[in-house]
């Protein structure tokens, strides 16, 4: 029995991927960039429909997570649980953006003009805050995630993120 031919490659996606791989500066090499972007692109498709937006988002996540010393897949799991990838999400307590950053942080660091619905800005804040809590918790991820969410002492949120992380690894 003959195996079916692979689906034809979408030329638009090929062009976008090539462009984003060439711009991906947080990867060790182009092969790693291409492999990771392709793998994550397929998983992110249900949340972000436009291929260019998906790849741009993934590059930003990889860059900010790597800069903060985090695994990009963990950051994707946090985003899935926090906002379902909605950059305009606002929680009942006022947290904003994909990583649901509390706006008081802007004034705390003297940057009240920062826009937390800007993906790069939100990722930068969120990744640094998450990394800080991981360090404070001596690497205990469940505790760090509970601190990040403001639910320290309860691990329901942490369990949700860990479950989501399984899907991104």
Each language-model region and where it sits:
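Catalytic glycan-binding domains that act on GlcNAc-containing polysaccharides
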Residues: 20-169
């Amino acid at each position: 029995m003959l195996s079916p031919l692979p689906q034809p490659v979408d030329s638009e996606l090929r062009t976008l991927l090539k462009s984003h791989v060439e711009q991906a500066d947080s990867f060790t090499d182009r092969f790693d960039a291409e492999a990771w972007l392709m793998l994550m692109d397929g998983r992110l498709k249900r949340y972000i429909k436009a291929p260019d937006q998906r790849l741009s988002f993934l590059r930003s996540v990889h860059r900010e997570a790597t800069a903060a010393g985090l695994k990009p897949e963990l950051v994707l799991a946090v985003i899935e649980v926090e906002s379902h990838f909605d950059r305009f999400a606002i929680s009942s307590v006022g947290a904003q953006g994909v990583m649901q950053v509390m706006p008081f942080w802007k004034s705390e660091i003297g940057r009240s003009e920062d826009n937390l619905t800007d993906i790069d800005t939100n990722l930068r804040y969120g990744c640094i805050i998450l990394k800080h809590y991981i360090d404070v918790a001596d690497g205990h991820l469940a505790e760090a995630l509970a601190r990040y969410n403001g639910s320290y002492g309860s691990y329901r949120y942490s369990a949700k993120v860990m479950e989501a992380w399984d899907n991104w690894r």
